[in-house]
Design a protein with these regions (language model features):
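Extended, charge-rich, solvent-exposed interface segments
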Residues: 78-87, 95-101
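OB-fold/S1-family single-stranded nucleic acid-binding modules
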Residues: 53-68, 113-125
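A short macromolecule-binding patch
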Residues: 27-31, 88-94
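Structural detector for short beta-strands of small beta-barrel domains
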Residues: 1-15, 61-81, 108-110
Length: 125
């Protein structure tokens, strides 16, 4: 690691759409820019390395099976969501919305997990 701080603790958990949740149910916030850039979806396995200076380093260690779909961006109660062809709606991270400059009506390629409530955007169509 760049700052040469030693690893104090390593924790494993699952991504819930916004956070990593470990086996005991403890929640660790995942930076939205990392989750968005890595296209994390619910169920992905993460490793968190906590350095002695308190710095968090997340690493994805396993991918959950992805369901790919084409959806349309909708504005719901001042939050953008992605609606698939079957009418299911998925939440999207704010960082993803900003990165892709998503607006209502845009068509996107996205992916989610079985039973997922969150989607990762792959591309704007």
């Amino acid at each position: 690691f760049q700052n040469e701080a030693k690893i104090l603790k390593t924790v494993f958990g699952q991504f819930d759409g916004q956070n990593m949740v470990d086996e005991q149910g403890k929640i660790y916030p995942v930076p939205g820019n990392y989750a968005s850039k890595s296209r994390l979806i619910e169920g992905d396995s993460l490793k968190l390395m906590i350095l002695e200076d308190g710095t968090y380093f997340f690493k994805r260690v396993d991918l959950v099976q992805r369901i790919k779909f084409i959806g349309r961006v909708l504005d719901r109660d001042e939050h953008l969501v992605i609606k698939d062809k079957e009418g299911r709606q998925y939440r999207v991270l704010e960082e993803t919305i900003r990165y892709f400059a998503l607006q209502e009506g845009m068509e996107v390629a996205a992916e989610t997990s079985e039973g997922g409530r969150w989607a990762a955007i792959v591309n704007v169509i």
